[in-house]
Amino acid sequence: MALSKRELDELKPWIEKTVKRVLGFSEPTVVTAALNCVGKGMDKKKAADHLKPFLDDSTLRFVDKLFEAVEEGRSSRHSKSSSDRSRKRELKEVFGDDSEISKESSGVKKRRIPRFEEVEEEPEVIPGPPSESPGMLTKLQIKQMMEAATRQIEERKKQLSFISPPTPQPKTPSSSQPERLPIGNTIQPSQAATFMNDAIEKARKAAELQARIQAQLALKPGLIGNANMVGLANLHAMGIAPPKVELKDQTKPTPLILDEQGRTVDATGKEIELTHRMPTLKANIRAVKREQFKQQLKEKPSEDMESNTFFDPRVSIAPSQRQRRTFKFHDKGKFEKIAQRLRTKAQLEKLQAEISQAARKTGIHTSTRLALIAPKKELKEGDIPEIEWWDSYIIPNGFDLTEENPKREDYFGITNLVEHPAQLNPPVDNDTPVTLGVYLTKKEQKKLRRQTRREAQKELQEKVRLGLMPPPEPKVRISNLMRVLGTEAVQDPTKVEAHVRAQMAKRQKAHEEANAARKLTAEQRKVKKIKKLKEDISQGVHISVYRVRNLSNPAKKFKIEANAGQLYLTGVVVLHKDVNVVVVEGGPKAQKKFKRLMLHRIKWDEQTSNTKGDDDEESDEEAVKKTNKCVLVWEGTAKDRSFGEMKFKQCPTENMAREHFKKHGAEHYWDLALSESVLESTD
């Protein structure tokens, strides 16, 4: 018979005990499987088959004990329910079937309101002022309540025994005695004592709860008007005269007393300094305590130790407790930097040792010492020093130079040897020889292509022979249709032609897909174009300097700026009257295109707006002389760039223009352009 979920929950502890008794440990999987068997109403045989994968040899023993546990759980549950039912019936027989008791109780209910009126007439129950309302019950009051409840129960027992004297009867089970006991019968003494204890416990709890409620209401006298009256009446009805309970004084802060000047004083008038407590964090408190602890550890040695002749104050005394070291991770790349620094230092020391050794052999160390000598004072521009700094090393101190030729012994460090300094390679030249690529003829290119295809075809044939790939389909075209297919083409030429055309379309599609895969995307084409324009300038930067007489036309300014940006050129355009200098830096190909722009594409001799209005009164000769043009001043290479992105700078004076070039270390560009402009104007 299948069981409900509630019954399975009640049987689960019994099954767990059985599993632990059989297996020696608890296993939730076996418990769940056993519950499923019991819940589905299986017999012992089916349950054994169901549990055999979990238990193996101990299955039968476990199933027997399982069903015994199930029966034991059912019997205990049934006995518990029957005992509850018998207990309820006995209570009903004792308290519910007595007519006089019911009448008495109904009378009590009917007289509930008059009883309050009687209580109000008694002077002892009338409460005092609201401040004296009852609080929590004391031990004495609880004892009085217990005695009153005991007296009531004793009186009730006497009434019951007076109505019908007790007669001992044999105890029979409830199932064999369905008829109810008569009204006059009494209960057994043990059951009466149990009921009496339950009644006393309930009365005590009710009294405690009532007293607690009254104590809470006493703290708020205006909340419920007659709450005190009702509580006192109930206590009086139980035969307890409640004493007057005084409320405890609530803890209030000490009143603040201020004098005429606003200072805090006590009752005697003495000034009081109040402690001001500021909010702080636990971390700050711990930090202060930590510092105090460190100060205690760093106490000075005692005087008797200092008086010792062997005492050394320079030696620090080790603390009694080791300082706590925090756990700290190293930054990423820290040890790589240290290792690189050590390697660089070792290489530098090795190089210095080699240089010094070579200098001792060749005698260059003397010239090196000469080169390290610098002038001791700053000379003004145009001043001639008495002795050049490279001669000061060989001329001793206090030596007076005269017109007569001094002796050779008067000088220091002069020998018959000639020192040749080591030649250095230029920083921008590349010593690697340039190798020209091998250019093949058409016949050689075809031969090389045939050989490459033959090698690839041979590799495919080897794979087909080894079974690594299937053999390729015959490459059929319309021209070789009859030769390849033969009889199939004769039998159904339409079908064969469709098959051949499908193969041709497939090959065409594969070819186009391969081309599309090799084709660069828009982003890749953009990167390729930028890479092509951004030339390699590691071997040197190509620089060109142009001079334009008039650069006031905004269209020409835009052309210069736009083309410089498109060709990734850097530089500057300095605008000055009759001397407009354009400096551009970049690769050789970009310089070639920009040179063509400046010297050929832009028409500089076109009439500008600035010269049009002012030259009306001038003669034709002056107009011819002031014809606008662009001149290439200088072009060459440098190691690095001097300017950034192309910008225009308006310089009203020559000094301002030269200072701008000097700031970038290229003032010679301005000097060269200005000198050519002056020479041209003089001509």
Curated annotation (Swiss-Prot):
Gene3D superfamilies: PWI domain (1.20.1390.10). The modification Phosphoserine is found at S164, S619. Residues 73-135, 153-183 are annotated as: Disordered. GO terms for cellular component: Cajal body; cytosol; nuclear speck; nucleoplasm; nucleus; spliceosomal complex; U2-type precatalytic spliceosome; U4/U6 x U5 tri-snRNP complex. Its main location: nucleus. There is a cross-link at K139, K244, K252 (Glycyl lysine isopeptide (Lys-Gly) (interchain with G-Cter in SUMO2)). It is found in: Nucleus; Nucleus speckle. PROSITE patterns: PWI. Residues 1-87 form the PWI domain. The modification Phosphothreonine is found at T167. GO terms for molecular function: identical protein binding; RNA binding. Signal peptide: none annotated. Component of the precatalytic spliceosome (spliceosome B complex). Component of the U4/U6-U5 tri-snRNP complex, a building block of the precatalytic spliceosome (spliceosome B complex). The U4/U6-U5 tri-snRNP complex is composed of the U4, U6 and U5 snRNAs and at least PRPF3, PRPF4, PRPF6, PRPF8, PRPF31, SNRNP200, TXNL4A, SNRNP40, SNRPB, SNRPD1, SNRPD2, SNRPD3, SNRPE, SNRPF, SNRPG, DDX23, CD2BP2, PPIH, SNU13, EFTUD2, SART1 and USP39, plus LSM2, LSM3, LSM4, LSM5, LSM6, LSM7 and LSM8. Interacts directly with PRPF4. Plays a role in pre-mRNA splicing as component of the U4/U6-U5 tri-snRNP complex that is involved in spliceosome assembly, and as component of the precatalytic spliceosome (spliceosome B complex). This is U4/U6 small nuclear ribonucleoprotein Prp3. It comes from Homo sapiens.
